[in-house]
Amino acid sequence: LISRLFAEEYGSEFVFVTHYPSKKRPFYAADDPEDPRYTLSFDLLFRGLEVTTGGQRIHDYDTQVAKMLKKGMNPEDFAGYLMIHKYGTCPHGGLGLGLERLTARLLGENNVRETCLFPRDQQRIEP
């Protein structure tokens, strides 16, 4: 629905949705400093399908540990991950593009398995 509305209003089939609630995003997503209920993250929708998710990551050790604790996680279980925060990392972000999802939408396929080289389902778990 949102993609259709943006296509009609702005002539684009791509829509960025930003500032997802913190409780709905992973432990490494940076909270918005102006309103920590939300994150500095986004989804890119294309024709109604999420084709990428991304955002700014937490880069401060104390902030990361506090968020893990808030989400009920044990920071000791993530000692290797936390090492980069403890000994220094710079502000950074990331995203993951779903190429098969994007290809499915571009080709008008109803199922992403039609655009995967080795699709998986309940009967096929190996190539």
Which role fits each region the language model picked out?
Residues L1-P127:
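A translation/RNA-centric and nucleic-acid-associated enzymatic feature enriched
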